[in-house]
Amino acid sequence: MSTYTRPVMLLLCGLLLLTLAIAVLNTLVPLWLAQANLPTWQVGMVSSSYFTGNLVGTLFTGYLIKRIGFNRSYYLASLIFAAGCVGLGVMVGFWSWMSWRFIAGIGCAMIWVVVESALMCSGTSHNRGRLLAAYMMAYYMGTFLGQLLVSKVSGELLHVLPWVTGMILAGILPLLFTRIVNQQTQARHSSSISAMLKLRQARLGVNGCIISGIVLGSLYGLMPLYLKHQGMANASIGFWMAVLVSAGILGQWPMGRLADKFGRLLVLRVQVFVVILGSIAMLTQAAMAPALFILGAAGFTLYPVAMAWACEKVEHHQLVAMNQALLLSYTVGSLLGPSFAAMLMQNYSDNLLFIMIASVSFIYLLMLLRNAGQTPNPVAHI
């Protein structure tokens, strides 16, 4: 049977449209808040509110999928995300935008859980890696195109919200023409998120997802603000964010092939080390293009390698629970990263954004080095 079946392709098409909308909002919301003269710590709190919504959405989507299936869960998630988008135009203010971004965060997390779980459950041990790679490519391509849109269109709030909302609703259309069936067989014992988080053999993968959340959450939430403080216009900010994300797209397949050949432990070490180098290079402000490129290539590919590490440690019937656990870990990191980095930037210097990213990456590198002789070195299937 073909890996890229009709339901899979339609699902990825819908994801591409939704990710476009997510990328546009994640870039422009911090800028809209800055234009409203909100302090940096409040900008960070709004970003954290979005990731708090991710946390909540991740927790209950597995139960929702079991009750109403993949298709209806996907429709509901998209409508919740659209509501969070429309709400931004109703009231402009710190507390109202915290609420709407929280709602949008719930919808986005539900979308990710539904899409990832559907791909994992429709695949086998022979093609699940290719499905995951296709998922990451679609996700990052949507993010890249979203950044380009920001650099080409008007960034005014009331100009952006109508077409972004339309794009979210258009993301529902592909799944109206297919039905995604859960081919996963019923397990004798249901798996829980907490059980997945406690697996010792998957701990490096879980920790990697947390670190990835800190790194990417901080970059998504605060990099536009950092660039704004450097005196850049919205179009330039969109361009540099596109450079960051395009590096992540280009790095997906090479990192997967390297992990397949040399093992995930070595690849994770190299990725984390390159994130540290990219952060240090950003502090020098001498060559932002190569610095952003290597930061994106390493930072954006950390999550799938860490995720593949953990998923290889569980049985087929545990994949949805493990997927939820990894998304939960990523979301916790995404919640903590922008909040802490925003406080550092507000009270001290914008450069502390990259110092924090380098510091947490160094801690994870120490974990990888310390566990070298204790943890098996699984080979990737991406």
From Swiss-Prot:
Source domain of life: Bacteria
Membrane spanning residue stretches: 8-28, 45-65, 75-95, 102-122, 131-151, 157-177, 204-224, 231-251, 270-290, 291-311, 325-345, 349-369
Annotated membrane topology: Multi-pass membrane protein
Record flagged with keyword Transmembrane: yes
Any one GO MF annotation of this record: transmembrane transporter activity
Locations listed in the record: Cell inner membrane
Record carries keyword Glycosyltransferase: no
Pfam families per record: MFS_1
Keyword entries, A-Z: Cell inner membrane, Cell membrane, Membrane, Transmembrane, Transmembrane helix, Transport
InterPro entries the record matches: MFS (IPR011701), MFS_dom (IPR020846), MFS_trans_sf (IPR036259), MFS_YcaD (IPR023745), MFS_YcaD-like (IPR047200)
GO CC annotation, single: plasma membrane
Main location: membrane
CDD domains: MFS_YcaD_like
Protein family according to the UniProt entry: Belongs to the major facilitator superfamily. YcaD (TC 2.A.1.26) family.
Record's protein name: Uncharacterized MFS-type transporter YcaD
Organism (species): Salmonella enteritidis PT4 (strain P125109)
